[in-house]
């Protein structure tokens, strides 16, 4: 759930940095003195670099083989642990721990989101509508293009329903969060504000845990694509290479991916805004 890793965690992380920094704003990080902005940017860069390595190693398991549900559960446990771990990190002397929680939290969120989203193709193929389309394709009454179009539309429909429900749920969660903030009197002091942010991260992680359990217990273990003789790891690399060759023929998709990457980096909007004002 992005409220914890993407919204509140960056705020808590940067709060601790500003409170721990001396008057000149220079702190020791990775073996040399750095400004707060430099520390934040380096943390984001480290997180992004690790994500690249992680996805190159295990990313193909999201689409191929039978490991996706197990990997998703393991990654979710890590994400929940990070969220609850913030309860112990709300004072400036623990800013280094905050850096670690922030970096690992971003990685855990992005990987869980990826492996969760990868379930939609399997869900789409197992709907009644797509089973009927598959039978029609085998019988020769529809073309491959018609089947692929129906498959794409079903994936989009399921994803839109899921994200719609998530967005509606977040409205109620945000309302509860406002109540928690007033209950903890976060405006009374710096310490209250720090503690309030840690509580909010843990609360959202608890909601994430609560709504995830039915998925993990009720999800049917549908196999992913067959990697064939290549194996899962090689199939993932081959798919990446094939996509890189084809992307130049889909210039709109390339522009979309570049724009999405830039916007995602910009989601750490607190970082960008702070830099503009400093």
Language model: regions and residue ranges:
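Helix-to-loop junctions at the C-terminal end of transmembrane segments
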Residues: 51-67
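Helix-terminus/helix-capping segments at the ends of transmembrane helices and short amphipathic helices
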Residues: 14, 18, 62, 117, ...
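Residue-level signature of mid-helix packing/kink "hotspots" within the transmembrane helices
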Residues: 45-56, 171, 209
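Transmembrane alpha-helix boundary/hinge residues in polytopic small-molecule transporters
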Residues: 8, 12, 57, 111-119, ...
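C-terminal ends and interior cores of transmembrane alpha-helices
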Residues: 45-48, 52, 72-99
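Small/hydrophobic positions within alpha-helical transmembrane segments
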Residues: 43-46, 50, 78, 104, ...
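Helix-loop boundary and gating motifs at the non-cytosolic
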Residues: 1-51, 252-278
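Intracellular loop-helix junctions on the cytosolic face of multi-pass helical membrane proteins
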Residues: 84-87, 93, 97, 111-269
């Amino acid at each position: 759930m992005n409220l914890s890793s993407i919204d509140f965690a960056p705020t808590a992380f940067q709060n601790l940095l500003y409170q721990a920094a001396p008057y000149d704003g220079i702190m020791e990080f990775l073996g040399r003195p750095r400004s707060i902005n430099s520390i934040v940017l380096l943390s984001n860069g480290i997180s992004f670099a690790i994500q690249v390595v992680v996805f190159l190693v295990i990313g193909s398991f999201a689409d191929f083989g039978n490991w996706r549900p197990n990997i998703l559960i393991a990654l979710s446990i890590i994400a929940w642990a990070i969220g609850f771990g913030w309860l112990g990190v709300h004072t400036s002397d623990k800013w280094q721990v905050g850096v670690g929680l922030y970096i690992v939290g971003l990685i855990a969120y992005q990987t869980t989101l990826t492996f969760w989203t990868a379930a939609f193709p399997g869900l789409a193929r197992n709907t009644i509508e797509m089973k009927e389309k598959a039978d029609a394709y085998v019988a020769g009454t529809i073309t491959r293009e018609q089947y692929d179009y129906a498959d794409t539309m079903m994936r989009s429909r399921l994803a839109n329903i899921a994200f719609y429900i998530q967005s509606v749920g977040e409205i109620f969660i945000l309302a509860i969060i406002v109540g928690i903030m007033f209950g903890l009197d976060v405006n009374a002091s710096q310490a209250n504000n720090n503690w309030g942010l840690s509580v909010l991260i843990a609360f959202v992680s608890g909601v994430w845990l609560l709504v995830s359990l039915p998925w993990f217990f009720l999800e049917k273990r549908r196999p992913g694509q067959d990697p064939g003789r290549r194996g899962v790891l090689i199939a993932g690399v081959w798919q990446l290479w094939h996509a890189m060759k084809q992307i130049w023929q889909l210039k709109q998709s390339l522009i979309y991916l570049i724009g999405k990457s830039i916007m995602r980096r910009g989601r750490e909007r607190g970082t960008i805004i702070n830099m503009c004002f400093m």
